[in-house]
Swiss-Prot record:
This is Uncharacterized protein C14F5.02. PANTHER family: TRAFFICKING PROTEIN PARTICLE COMPLEX II-SPECIFIC SUBUNIT 65. The lineage of its organism: Eukaryota, Fungi, Dikarya, Ascomycota, Taphrinomycotina. One of its GO terms (biological process) is intra-Golgi vesicle-mediated transport. It comes from the Eukaryota. Residues 148-162 have a biased composition (Basic and acidic residues). Its main location: cytoplasm. It is found in: Cytoplasm; Nucleus. Keywords: Cytoplasm, Nucleus. GO terms for cellular component: cytosol; nucleus; trans-Golgi network; TRAPPII protein complex. Residues 146-171 are annotated as: Disordered. The keyword Membrane does not apply.
Length: 515
């Protein structure tokens, strides 16, 4: 164990330092850079300061001596910025700690006084930030003598005392014999005595090796300070994908994986909420007790079905992922307390055929029908699909559209709802493969309905704007219903701004065999 009287450091744990576990101080020290401290809105941390006891009576400890503790959040605007003064600073907490010590620690015939303080982190919204904690020895005359938490966050730039990293006086009797004479222990305090529940974090946690500031001497101030900076980030990577089945229904796919800073995460639950739509879980079927463990290379997918009302164009989606982070400590996998990662709201827009404006090439006039036909002919299109598909399964046709023109183009892909077996329909209905019949239920001459073999999950797909010299990929989803041979060449593409032209085929050869 490193000597408490020679080095200042932070300890991060998930239990408060109490009388019954004071003997485990070595464990707190050993885990200082291996266990993360998660925090968020109205979240409490337990801070313990330490200094050696030298020929003093603890019961008559001077009341005018103690510690001032300040936590500051810093946003990193530019990666190359190294000076802390270039960061916008926001006060996270500020408190004083003085009076009789909370605990006494004895090691190698030396005694150390420990002061336990409770600090509350204010809410914040920095996406990329650091947590910087300063501990000042001695209460300055112009500071309030209070141990209450200052919960009113303010811009750190307006407080000169925070931007000045004060130092210690070599003549001070408690400092002259040792290089550093106090420590800061930070612990997650969510037990009953602190009345704090596991936090819903706004996207951050403290972790890893930290920067210990160099000591700076200022003869005008009889204080000593040590500073340490922790990186803050999200331990969970969450990616969202949306696929529109039709104008009212969309699949929302959530892909969850551990952050690069984590070795393992365990997903305990996942919930998605919207403000004006109906969302239901599609897969997996039993989300209540997932208990999915992911390593750094693993991903887990959750799919929701989103139903958007007809009068709503945009909705907000918010996801909550309940997670436990597990790290290796001395060859043992140590789990943290469960916490909930709250993903920032995502705006989802429905696809709608309301784009009826006229695209203009220049101020000279509108795009003519001939130009529109030419633009479709110049459009580079490719499509691919599996040759064999088992019945009862779903499959997709991948379409790639490249716009070589000097202006954007908005397209609509039309897909027949039903496709029929070529052999059967060629015998009985010579026109069954026409565009007029491909999306309708066909019947035998005696009135019996012919069962379709392939059913499309959506009959329309709007591409949105494909910008000049850009390409887009789209997946068209189908259900293989009945064995047979099927032709999907009736899939067509239209320019939504100019409906006078003849649609273009997606591909002339899209043959699917359902086994």
């Amino acid at each position: 164990m490193r000597n408490l009287n020679t080095e200042l450091d932070f300890f991060v744990s998930f239990s408060a330092l109490k009388e019954e576990n004071i003997s485990q101080l070595k464990v707190y020290w050993a885990q200082s850079n291996l266990v993360e401290l998660y925090y968020g809105e109205s979240f409490y941390i337990n801070i313990v300061c330490s200094r050696p006891i030298v020929d003093e009576n603890v019961t008559t400890w001077p009341e005018n001596e103690g510690f001032r503790i300040e936590g500051t959040l810093l946003e990193s605007l530019v990666e190359s910025v190294t000076s802390a003064s270039n960061y916008p600073k926001v006060n996270a907490f500020s408190l004083m700690c003085s009076g009789i010590p909370s605990f006494i620690w004895v090691e190698d015939d030396k005694q150390y006084a420990l002061w336990a303080c409770l600090a509350q982190l204010d809410s914040y919204s920095y996406p990329n930030h650091k947590l910087e904690i300063h501990v000042y020895k001695h209460i300055l005359p112009d500071l309030p003598q209070s141990s209450e938490v200052d919960r009113n966050s303010e811009t750190e730039g307006t407080r000169e005392e925070n931007s000045n990293t004060s130092d210690w006086d070599e003549q001070n009797e408690y400092v002259s014999e040792v290089e550093g004479d106090y420590n800061l222990l930070g612990s997650l305090s969510n037990d009953i005595q602190f009345r704090s529940n596991p936090p819903v974090i706004s996207g951050a946690y403290v972790f890893g090796e930290s920067d210990v500031a160099n000591e700076l001497k200022d003869p005008s101030r009889k204080t000593k300070t040590r500073k340490k900076v922790f990186e803050c980030s999200v331990p969970v990577v969450l990616k969202l994908r949306s696929y529109a089945l039709n104008e009212s229904n969309q699949y929302i796919t959530s892909i969850v994986s551990p952050d690069s800073s984590c070795e393992n995460i365990r997903i305990l639950g996942f919930k998605a909420e919207t403000n004006a739509a109906t969302i239901s879980l599609f897969a997996p079927k039993t989300p209540e007790k997932l208990q999915i463990t992911l390593s750094s290379s693993d991903v887990f997918t959750i799919i929701h079905l989103l139903q958007i009302p007809d009068n709503i164009k945009h909705i907000e989606l918010q996801c909550f992922c309940k997670v436990i982070v597990a790290q290796k400590l001395s060859e043992t996998l140590v789990e943290s307390m469960p916490f909930t990662y709250k993903h920032p709201p995502v705006l989802i827009t429905r696809r709608t055929p309301t784009k009826t404006h006229t695209k203009q090439l220049s101020s000279s006039g509108n795009v003519s029908a001939a130009q529109s036909i030419s633009s479709l002919n110049l459009l580079e299109i490719s499509a691919s699909s599996p040759s064999y598909v088992p019945s009862g399964s779903s499959f997709s046709v991948r379409a790639n559209l490249y716009n070589p023109l000097d202006f954007s183009i908005d397209l609509l892909i039309r897909i027949p709802l039903y496709c029929y077996d070529d052999c059967l329909t060629n015998k009985e209905h010579s026109t069954s493969k026409s565009e007029e019949k491909s999306s309708e239920l066909l019947k035998y001459p005696n009135g019996h309905t012919i069962s379709p073999g392939i059913i499309a999950l959506s009959t329309k797909l709007y591409t949105g704007s494909i910008f000049p010299k850009c390409e887009k990929d789209f997946d068209l989803h189908f259900l293989a219903y009945k064995p047979g041979s099927y032709d999907l060449s009736s899939i067509s593409i239209e320019d939504v701004n100019h409906v006078v032209h003849k649609p273009r085929k997606l591909s002339k050869e899209l043959q699917i065999i359902v086994t």
